[in-house]
């Protein structure tokens, strides 16, 4: 551990300690007040990152278990801290995060992008629809729209814009402005189309269960959001193209796609395996009721399989 990480760790540890020595506000128990301090420290830890995010969260969980065991007076068991992990929804999102990381690590996300550019990216309007199809393909397995748009889609589309002579400070209206607007608006749409497309959907599903007492499956969510989502995805690039027309109309997409695919090389065995797992995961989530298998079971199988790649 270097000195910088050590100071970050000291700051994180100081937060719950300081809050713990302060009197609890009216209406809050001492336990709730200390847990708030741990929660706040975890958020700060995720921002300043003295360690990778999983390590920060594991430390927060461990600290919470120690506090609950000593301050609850027997009202709560330490296992209550882990109760959220018994939810099938949680494991569904975990598995989707695993898949999203695999898309980045294996390069399959990039390969899909360049294939789409080669097929339908001969015009700037076509490039707008490349962002649609790419985001739509990745959305079911990427429960972070920031990771999806910023980690996979944006770097590729940005490199295309730069290759076409469009840079943020010099010539954004050449093509870059249109493409960036397309990415932003498209990812907002795909985020609500699938339950596993955005982490915030977990909260929405819980509110639906609590208020309306409805149990919505992965397939049910996708079916309900599918029609409005598809309409929005078909219209969005065209509307942006009309409102912010790019200066470039034609694109040498074949050259861009060929160069990108050449850099990636032939499709590797890990990419093929990931593609197979991804398709099977989607089929499992969509037809879980017909197959008599719980969605969380499919999620855990997916996670276990991903560890083998």
What spans do the regions from the language model cover?
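Loop-to-transmembrane alpha-helix initiation sites
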Residues: 33, 81-91, 221-231, 295-298
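Generic alpha-helical transmembrane segments of integral inner-membrane proteins
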Residues: 10-18, 40-43, 62, 94, ...
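Transmembrane alpha-helix interface/packing and boundary motifs in multi-pass membrane proteins
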Residues: 44-52, 134-144, 184-195, 284-290, ...
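Membrane-embedded alpha-helical segments and adjacent helix-loop junctions characteristic
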Residues: 24, 55, 59-167
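Juxtamembrane and boundary regions of transmembrane helices in multi-pass small-molecule transporters
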Residues: 1-22, 145-149, 164-269, 273
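Membrane-interface helix termini and inter-helical loops of multi-pass transporters
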Residues: 24-29, 72-84, 209-218, 289-291
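Membrane-interfacial loop-to-helix junctions in multi-pass transporters
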Residues: 30-34, 86-90, 116-133, 168-181, ...
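Flexible hinge motifs at transmembrane-helix junctions and intramembrane kinks/re-entrant loops
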Residues: 25-30, 40-59, 81, 238-242, ...
């Amino acid at each position: 551990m270097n000195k910088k990480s050590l100071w970050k760790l000291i700051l994180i540890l100081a937060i719950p300690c300081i809050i713990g020595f302060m009197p609890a506000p009216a209406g809050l128990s001492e336990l709730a007040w200390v847990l708030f301090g741990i929660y706040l420290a975890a958020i700060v830890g995720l921002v300043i990152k003295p360690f990778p995010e999983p390590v920060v969260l594991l430390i927060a969980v461990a600290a919470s278990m120690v506090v609950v065991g000593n301050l609850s007076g027997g009202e709560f068991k330490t296992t209550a801290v882990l109760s959220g992990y018994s939810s099938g929804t949680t494991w569904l999102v975990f598995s989707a995060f695993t898949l999203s990381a695999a898309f980045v690590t294996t390069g399959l996300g990039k390969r899909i992008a360049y294939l789409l550019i080669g097929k339908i990216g001969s015009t700037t309007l076509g490039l707008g629809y490349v962002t649609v199809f790419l985001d739509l393909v990745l959305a079911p397995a990427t429960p972070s729209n920031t990771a999806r748009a910023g980690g996979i889609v944006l770097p590729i589309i940005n490199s295309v814009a730069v290759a076409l002579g469009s840079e943020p400070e010099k010539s954004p209206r050449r093509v870059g402005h249109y493409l960036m607007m397309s990415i932003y608006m498209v990812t907002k749409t795909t985020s609500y189309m699938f339950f596993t497309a955005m982490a915030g959907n977990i909260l929405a599903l819980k509110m639906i269960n609590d208020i309306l007492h409805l149990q919505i499956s992965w397939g049910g969510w996708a079916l309900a959001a599918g029609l409005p989502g598809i309409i929005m995805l078909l219209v969005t690039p065209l509307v942006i193209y009309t409102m912010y027309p790019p200066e470039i109309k034609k694109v040498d997409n074949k050259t861009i796609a060929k160069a990108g695919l050449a850099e990636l090389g032939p499709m590797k065995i890990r990419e093929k395996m990931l593609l197979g797992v991804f398709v099977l995961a989607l089929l499992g989530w969509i037809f879980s009721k017909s197959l008599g298998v719980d969605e969380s079971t499919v999620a855990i199988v997916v996670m276990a399989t991903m560890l083998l790649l």
